[in-house]
Amino acid sequence: MDPRLREEVVRLIIALTSDNGASLSKGLESRVSALEKTSQIHSDTILRITQGLDDANKRIIALEQSRDDLVASVSDAQLAISRLESSIGALQTVVNGLDSSVTQLGARVGQLETGLAELRVDHDNLVARVDTAERNIGSLTTELSTLTLRVTSIQADFESRISTLERTAVTSAGAPLSIRNNRMTMGLNDGLTLSGNNLAIRLPGNTGLNIQNGGLQFRFNTDQFQIVNNNLTLKTTVFDSINSRIGATEQSYVASAVTPLRLNSSTKVLDMLIDSSTLEINSSGQLTVRSTSPNLRYPIADVSGGIGMSPNYRFRQSMWIGIVSYSGSGLNWRVQVNSDIFIVDDYIHICLPAFDGFSIADGGDLSLNFVTGLLPPLLTGDTEPAFHNDVVTYGAQTVAIGLSSGGAPQYMSKNLWVEQWQDGVLRLRVEGGGSITHSNSKWPAMTVSYPRSFT
């Protein structure tokens, strides 16, 4: 709104509110009419200005669009110029290549001129050689005429000889003759062969046939065969013997069998049906009553065909004089002992005496080698346990071992058990109980027991 119009409206409002419009009521209508006209004029002016602004905005937008089109056209022109510059560079390269090609073409033309000069020389040589060839052809023509005369003179002789061959030549042959590759051959079966230039009969080996004195002979054993009335027969001595043996066989021949006997017609074997639960054939081929042996359990066993106590079930005593070896954490030492060994039933008891050793670790092994040192009647295998190395340990016990460095020993409780037996060497495990600084160890007497093997 126009500022002057605004001030006029404010002034009128103040005047109206001051005396309820009484003083201004007379001139108000004319002034309001004037204000309405002024407002209408201002509205028309604002409308024209607004329309002018819209037209100006449209023209600005059109100008901006034209500017964008011009920018795009300039970019296209720059791109086209760049392409033209590239094409000009390529044309320059082609022109340079054409210059090089023209130079090479000039060199090749020079070479062609040199080659044409050489071709002229070769042409002259060819002309000379053609002249020589013409002279040689004339000589050959003369020789060919001479050869024609010779062939004509020989033709009559050849015709006469060919006629003679046609009259006398063999062109076909009857069986067993045949013509193959201008040769006449004869077909022979397996019974005939050629011996030199003669036809002979083929006689296979070991048939008794032989050709001798122009005839076919048959050879036979005169001790067993003879010829009677042109027939080959057995001699009486041979025939009578065979006849006698056949008669004896017929008399002893078993044609059938009665139960419990059975005759197998396919194998010609006579056997007997038996109840295998009560009868059996012994090692002598005799029929015996089957004896039922009871299932014996240890210590009862079959002893020499009878029932008795197992030989392993008894008390045996012996001695082992050998070396006890200790090893553990780099410590190794050996001592010799005399040990009593007792075998009672299925257990073996090894009584080790007290002995003095050297330094031991917190855990180590005692090894007893039974390969040597066992006194009769025990053998190395008698010490084999029922196990070799198992999770189950035997002979577990606690032993008090005195450790010292020359003074009074201090006893440590160690756990000892059977760990392994291999190839006659029994290994005992000793560990636990702690340790002190020492150089000597005092081992008590102890007994190691474990079940032994019966294999």
UniProtKB/Swiss-Prot annotation:
Q: Where is this region: Head?
A: 308-455
Entries under InterPro entries matching the protein = Adenovirus_pIV-like_att, Attachment_protein_shaft_sf, S1_C
Query: Where does the record say carbohydrate is attached?
Result: 231, 264, 282
Annotated signal peptide: none
Which SUPFAM superfamilies does the protein's record reference? Fibre shaft of virus attachment proteins, Tropomyosin, Virus attachment protein globular domain
Q: How is it modified after translation?
A: Undergoes dramatic conformational rearrangements during viral disassembly in the endocytic pathway.
One BP term from GO = virion attachment to host cell
Write down the superkingdom of origin.
Viruses
Q: Where in the cell is it found?
A: Virion
CC per GO annotation? viral outer capsid
Where is region (Tail) located? 1-307
Ranges in a coiled coil? 116-148
Q: Which UniProt keywords apply?
A: Capsid protein, Coiled coil, Glycoprotein, Hemagglutinin, Host-virus interaction, Outer capsid protein, Viral attachment to host cell, Virion, Virus entry into host cell
Subunit structure as annotated in this protein's UniProt entry = Homotrimer. Interacts (via the head region) with human F11R.
The entry sums up its family as follows: Belongs to the orthoreovirus sigma-1 protein family.
Quote the function comment for this protein: Fiber-like molecule that attaches the virion to the host cell membrane by binding to the primary receptor F11R/JAM-A and to sialic acid containing proteins (coreceptor). The interaction of sigma-1 with F11R is required for NF-kB activation and apoptosis. Binding to both sialic acid and F11R is required to induce maximal levels of apoptosis.
Q: What is this protein called?
A: Outer capsid protein sigma-1
